[in-house]
Amino acid sequence: MPLIIILFLFLPYEILHSMDEYFLTLRNDKVNLRQGPSFNYPIKIFYKKKFLPVLIQDKSNNFRKIRDHENNSGWIHISQLSKKKAAIVINDNIILFSNSTIYSNPLAILKKGRLVKINKCKDKWCKVHTEEFKGWLQKESLWGLL
């Protein structure tokens, strides 16, 4: 047991840190998800949604292993990923509010699967925008945030 602890202490920080999962978004509206971490692997899925959030699970050179909100997984080249924040509404008929409280004015009802861009988050709420609306959603209704 002490040997394991000693070995763990000598692992480089980057190796330990690289095991953390985090979210990025698709940079373009045409992105290939591949079966493995190189251009030689076949394409599994062809994404057509810019800013779609993906969970980064692993890395290999210039490729990142991702999982999307439908549990599809595979590899995407880093040039196709962005740090811009976005999320997917995971429940149906979610109310977009004018402020970060359920007692504020309702602005719109968003359907499951709707892509929203994230402006900022605080506590259990995120300020988001779509093409038509700006407002606040509860974090628990969104996929793409940690």
Give the positions of each predicted feature.
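Classical Sec-dependent N-terminal signal peptides that target proteins to the secretory pathway
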Residues: 1-19
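SH3-family beta-barrel domains
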Residues: 15-35, 45-50, 57-99, 103-124, ...
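Second-shell loop/turn segments in exported
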Residues: 37-41
